[in-house]
Amino acid sequence: MAREXSKENTR
C-alpha cells in the first residue's frame, strides 16, 4: 500500500 494515497485519505 502506498503511503501517498494514505496521506490524501487522512487529509
Curated annotation (Swiss-Prot):
One of its GO terms (cellular component) is cytoplasm. Induction: By salt stress. It is found in: Cytoplasm. The keyword Zinc does not apply. Its main location: cytoplasm. Keywords: Cytoplasm, Elongation factor, GTP-binding, Nucleotide-binding, Protein biosynthesis, Stress response. GO terms for molecular function: GTP binding; translation elongation factor activity. Disulfide bonds: none annotated. Belongs to the GTP-binding elongation factor family. EF-G/EF-2 subfamily. Catalyzes the GTP-dependent ribosomal translocation step during translation elongation. During this step, the ribosome changes from the pre-translocational (PRE) to the post-translocational (POST) state as the newly formed A-site-bound peptidyl-tRNA and P-site-bound deacylated tRNA move to the P and E sites, respectively. Catalyzes the coordinated movement of the two tRNA molecules, the mRNA and conformational changes in the ribosome. This is Elongation factor G. It comes from Bacillus cereus. The lineage of its organism: Bacteria, Bacillati, Bacillota, Bacilli, Bacillales.
